[in-house]
Amino acid sequence: MKNRAYIVHFAGIFAMILWGMSFVWSTQAYQNLNPTTTIFLRLVVATVFFTAILFLFHLNEKIHRKDLKLFALAAMFEPFLYFIFEGYGLKNTSPVIGSGLIAMIPLVTPIAARIFLKERLTPMNILGFIVSFVGVIVMLINKNLEFTASPKGILFLCGAVLVAVG
């Protein structure tokens, strides 16, 4: 049982490394390919991979017809619109700024839950958002307090954050 814990921790660390590197890889890919093309290829590869896993391990789940609209809506937001916004955001900014803004998703989520679901915000939620927001501002301005990032790229990345939260 102890070995299983190590496998889970290793898998988590490996996933974080891949996630962090994906910003750099995406930026490199966008130098040669349009973000839409890259996203299409990424989703095709993921579809083939996960479909193979479904059949290989017999993980087929029957989806009720009434749930198809909700699945389609969810797929439209995540991954489709999220990747579109993130892709064009990374094409217009640096991977550092992109990863910093995308890292705000877990901090914006409680705020959206407060607005739409009337959930309570904890002091840690508020503190986390403030610290993260200040960190993003520090990344976006230079020592002369001038805005250095592309506003277009920032807007696309903010769109990715909002779509991921929605």
Regions found by a protein language model. Give the residues of each.
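Glycine-/small-residue-enriched transmembrane alpha-helix faces in small-molecule transporters
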Residues: 1-37, 147-166
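Transmembrane alpha-helices of multi-pass small-molecule transport proteins
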Residues: 8, 32-81, 108-109, 162-166
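Specific transmembrane alpha-helical segments of multi-pass solute transporters/efflux pumps
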Residues: 18, 22-23, 51-98, 102, ...
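Hydrophobic side-chain positions within alpha-helical transmembrane segments
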Residues: 25, 85, 108-112
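Hydrophobic/aromatic residues within transmembrane alpha-helices
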Residues: 29, 38, 42, 89, ...
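Structural signature of hydrophobic alpha-helical transmembrane segments
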Residues: 34-46, 87-105, 150-162
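C-terminal transmembrane-helix exit sites in multi-pass transporters
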Residues: 49-61, 105-130
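Hydrophobic transmembrane alpha-helices of multi-pass small-molecule transport proteins
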Residues: 50, 72, 121-142, 160-161
